[in-house]
Regions:
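An aromatic- and histidine-rich active-site surface loop
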Residues: 97-118, 122-131
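Conserved donor-binding/catalytic core segment of Leloir-type glycosyltransferases
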Residues: 3-7, 211-236, 249
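An amphipathic, basic-hydrophobic alpha-helix
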Residues: 66-96, 107, 115, 146-150
């Protein structure tokens, strides 16, 4: 049976879009007869044992601090995760390493893959330096921004295969000189079976939220610039021309929440 070790920033039982995508990938691989495990780095901060099962998937943890000034701290973090990967590979003998964003995970997996002679798949879910700019924790073209991008490029160049979650990320890599033939796209998706039978509409809830009687477009996520909510707001007047009385309901929080409220009022 083929074995794949997934190298992760964090995982179940924590809940996030990151962990839900990971769960879907690992479950799909299990369905295909592939044996999978996950290994998280130092940024998985939840309490728990060093080896933990969640939803039928076994996860291993990397322990210990990575101290020091910025830059050196991340380098030590990569080294510690690489050591964990090598140790687990000696015990479990995976056929493939599958590293997921951020580049810190990719760099650690690349180091271990080269040492052990194991093929590496690197999956990019976002460019984290751009995400930091979008959520206000980073600045474009800063030293940290440029170093993060250089590290990403290093991992992409060394990986045996590269996966992105969308065409935009692939196009960005191609613009940096990466061969398009090396990049596959694996978009996000939803397993409708997990939702069960559709729940009947609740008239009282519709009235309380002032959703009217027409179709409702819902968004559950985070209010950040890169989520594209501005496009959704701009599309609502166009949708109203083809759909009778559409409504839009958001369930989220984030730094640009007030901006979206102003945009909504401007279209009212």
């Amino acid at each position: 049976m083929t074995r794949v070790l997934h190298v992760l920033d964090h995982s179940l039982p924590l809940h996030s879009g990151y962990t839900f995508r990971t769960r879907a990938i690992l479950k799909a691989q299990q369905t295909c007869g592939i044996e999978v495990r996950g290994l998280t780095g130092l940024r998985h901060l939840a309490d728990g044992p060093d080896m933990e099962e969640a939803e039928g998937i076994l996860f291993h943890r990397t322990r210990g601090p990575a101290s020091g000034p910025a830059g050196l701290r991340e380098w030590r973090e990569i080294a510690r995760l690489a050591e964990s990967i090598e140790k687990l590979c000696e015990q479990w003998r995976p056929d493939v390493l599958h590293a997921h964003s951020p580049a810190l995970c990719g760099a650690a997996a690349l180091r271990a893959a080269r040492k052990l002679g194991i093929p590496l798949v690197y999956e990019i879910r976002a460019f984290w330096e751009d995400a930091a700019v979008g959520n206000g924790t980073g600045r474009e073209n800063s030293l940290k921004y440029r170093l993060t991008r250089r590290l990403e490029d290093h991992v992409v160049a060394g990986a045996d295969a590269v996966v992105t979650i969308c065409q935009g990320l692939k196009d960005d890599l191609v613009s940096r000189g990466v061969d398009a033939e090396r990049i596959n796209i694996s978009p996000n998706g939803v397993d409708l079976a997990l939702f069960g039978a559709p729940v009947a509409a609740d008239p009282a809830l519709r009235k309380a939220l002032d959703l009217g009687t027409g179709p409702v477009i819902g968004f559950i996520g985070s209010f950040y610039d890169y989520e594209g909510i501005d496009d959704l707001i701009a599309a609502m007047p166009l949708l109203s021309q083809v759909i009778p009385v559409p409504a839009c309901c958001w369930l989220a929080a984030g730094r640009v929440r007030r901006h979206y409220r102003r945009r909504r009022r401007s279209l009212a």
